[in-house]
Amino acid sequence: MSKLFIYFLICVSCILLTNYDTFLYGIIFILFALINLFNRYKLDKKTIIIVIILITFCFTKYFISKISLFETNKYFGIVLDKKDNYFVFFNGLKKFYVSYKGSTIDELDLIILTGKQENFHFSTLESGFDFNKYLINKGIFKSLNLENVDVIVGFPIQFYSFKESILSKFDTLEQKALVGGILFSEFDYNNDFANQVKILNLFSLFSVSGVYLNFFLYTFVKLFELKFTKKVSEILSLILFTPFLIINITRFTTIRVVAFYVFRMINKYNFNNYFSKNERISILGILFIIIDPFIVFSTAFYLSFLISII
């Protein structure tokens, strides 16, 4: 077990410790990580400092997201996610749930909105889906009661509008659920068919894990190798994949697959395979947690990383 992987486990453990439902897992993981770090490696000053920095950062990031800081009535930030009746807004420090049914804003738009911070509370659906827990696990602890919103810089691609235009071509909920899951890494858990697929783990395997995306990339590598070298084939496959990446640039599964693919190429051709697969996974995992610690609670994170490690 590499030291980088132990650092990765420590980061994951710290985030798990912040949630009541995963607290026990956090204890187990961090004890496992620290014991292995103590037994396998010399605990020099550098190692201790790195561990302290990682633990401090993870907990600080969590508490900044949870506590109320710099409350005002006007906020500038970016739209991280857009749904039918709400969007997720990020002001650089915290993410907010914003109820919204309009069509003037889309994902990755830079906006200024006026509103007041409030606590949110949603009823649990009959299917057992708890939207409150869903938002909290995404690092969203407050909502903004929207009074006004202005788009400062609109992103060139309207992701939500494009997705809706594609899904509108399908008549049944079953078709929309499958296409939405495969093309856009989205799934409607309120749909009976969706729940059936969820039970069978088909969606988790093909959509959340990104297995089919890796299959696409490496299949075309093999096809291009009939004509080109290995390196050129891998680059061409990535170029061919670029349109899919663009329309899913806000989806973790797609970003994770591309990041692993590109890092593997860089490690192979520029660093002469200096980093092992385990170390590459650890480095990217730590980077993802630094960007958004709450990604640890998503199925896409632990399922995709588990498959990658295996």
Specify the residue positions occupied by each region the protein language model found.
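Aromatic-rich juxtamembrane segments at the membrane interface
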Residues: 139-266
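SH3/SH3-like beta-barrel fold
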Residues: 86-91
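Flexible glycine-rich surface loops and low-complexity tracts that mediate binding to linear polymers
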Residues: 77-80, 106-125
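Membrane-interface helix-boundary motifs at transmembrane edges
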Residues: 37-47, 225-230, 270-275
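Structural detector for short beta-strands of small beta-barrel domains
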Residues: 68-84
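Beta-strand/loop nucleic-acid-binding surfaces
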Residues: 92-105
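Internal transmembrane alpha-helical bundles of multi-pass membrane proteins
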Residues: 8-12, 250-310
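N-terminal leader/targeting segments
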Residues: 1-67, 239, 254-257, 266, ...
